[in-house]
Amino acid sequence: MSEALKILNNIRTLRAQARECTLETLEEMLEKLEVVVNERREEESAAAAEVEERTRKLQQYREMLIADGIDPNELLNSMAAAKSGTKAKRAARPAKYSYVDENGETKTWTGQGRTPAVIKKAMEEQDKQLEDFLIKE
């Protein structure tokens, strides 16, 4: 809450501040505050009316489903079953580079993600190029 709102919300502080204003100024502020409060009330009632209308429509659709012999839970379950299909997995990328690690094992790398430390070290210290590690077909 801002300092101005804290002042407006505290009756003692508000009285102290009001002593410094004329009655005309206080009445003008009151009119403006009433306008703001009325606007807020209208917004709140409009939002409540929207919620009520939505609830009414949902109830109407539910009654229509029941009249047609369809259980709403059955409809929800069928929608969930249709939606819950697993995401298609993408194919693994083929290896593009081959290298020998510190343990003497031959490993491969697709070229995606971080460069393996062995390749990085060879490129920095031994002046090798990435093309030197390409898998030849």
Curated annotation (Swiss-Prot):
Site (Interacts with Hha): R12
Keyword DNA-binding: yes
Name of the protein: DNA-binding protein H-NS
Localization per Swiss-Prot or TrEMBL: Cytoplasm, Nucleoid
Keywords: Cytoplasm, DNA-binding, Repressor, Transcription, Transcription regulation
Any one GO molecular-function label of the UniProt entry: structural constituent of chromatin
InterPro entries documented for this protein: H-NS-like_N, H-NS_C_dom, H-NS_C_dom_sf, Histone_HNS, Histone_HNS_N
UniProt-listed SMART domains: HNS
Role summary: A DNA-binding protein implicated in transcriptional repression and chromosome organization and compaction. Binds nucleation sites in AT-rich DNA and bridges them, forming higher-order nucleoprotein complexes and condensing the chromosome. As many horizontally transferred genes are AT-rich, it plays a central role in silencing foreign genes. A subset of genes are repressed by H-NS in association with other proteins.
Highest taxon listed in the record's lineage: Bacteria
Family label: Belongs to the histone-like protein H-NS family.
Main location: cytoplasm
